[in-house]
């Protein structure tokens, strides 16, 4: 059955990170550009996959890539915090709600995303797996803009502080696996294995 497209909430793919722990052959690599599944890059995989669920998917990053897609460019070149991407997205898109997801969480199910997008009476609705809060796999309302501005002004880039000081709610999910974050090459290899296993049923 085809997924009904979410057309009233844009999805912003957060890809402005540092990849500091992602090392291949003793060299730091940009994980967004690592080949993934049958796609030339993780970026292309995530963008293509999310377009099956959202009418509008935009990539938030420091610079645009070869992939033909809409980009939101983060101007802060030497500072790495997802808060810049979230703040910039609200200023640019001028929309009440935005769903955010990091580039390096390719296993999050559409069911989980739909569950998060289905609750709209909080400022931040985020995913929580058995061991961890996932503040970046989340639906945000534009009424967080003042809190975002204040956090950036005071240089408090801790996402947990901001979320806990706004009307937020955690949605509990019992599958740890789907929230696997590809911080390292080992995580990346594990994700590839999981998808292979899923494909073979």
Curated annotation (Swiss-Prot):
Enzyme category, top tier: transferase
EC number(s) recorded for this UniProt protein: 2.7.7.77
Subcellular location: Cytoplasm
Any single GO CC term annotated in Swiss-Prot or TrEMBL for this entry: cytoplasm
The keyword DNA repair is assigned to this record: no
GO molecular function: GTP binding; metal ion binding; molybdenum cofactor guanylyltransferase activity
Cofactor(s) required for function per UniProt: Mg(2+)
Binding positions for Mg(2+) per the UniProt entry: 104
Keywords, alphabetical: Cytoplasm, GTP-binding, Magnesium, Metal-binding, Molybdenum cofactor biosynthesis, Nucleotide-binding, Transferase
Xref: InterPro entries: MobA-like_NTP_Trfase, Molybde_CF_guanTrfase, Nucleotide-diphossugar_trans
Gene Ontology BP term (one): bis(molybdopterin guanine dinucleotide)molybdenum biosynthetic process
Disulfide bonds: none
Binding of GTP, residues: 14-16, 31, 104
Catalysed conversion reaction: Mo-molybdopterin + GTP + H(+) = Mo-molybdopterin guanine dinucleotide + diphosphate
HAMAP family cross-referenced by the UniProt entry: MobA
Homology family: Belongs to the MobA family.
Free-text note on domains in this protein's UniProt record: The N-terminal domain determines nucleotide recognition and specific binding, while the C-terminal domain determines the specific binding to the target protein.
Task of the protein: Transfers a GMP moiety from GTP to Mo-molybdopterin (Mo-MPT) cofactor (Moco or molybdenum cofactor) to form Mo-molybdopterin guanine dinucleotide (Mo-MGD) cofactor.
Oligomer status and interactors: Monomer.
NCBIfam families xref list: PRK00560.1 (NF001837)
Protein name per the record: Molybdenum cofactor guanylyltransferase
Native source organism of the sequence: Helicobacter pylori (strain HPAG1)
Lineage, uppermost ranks: Bacteria, Pseudomonadati, Campylobacterota, Epsilonproteobacteria, Campylobacterales
Gene name tied to this protein: mobA
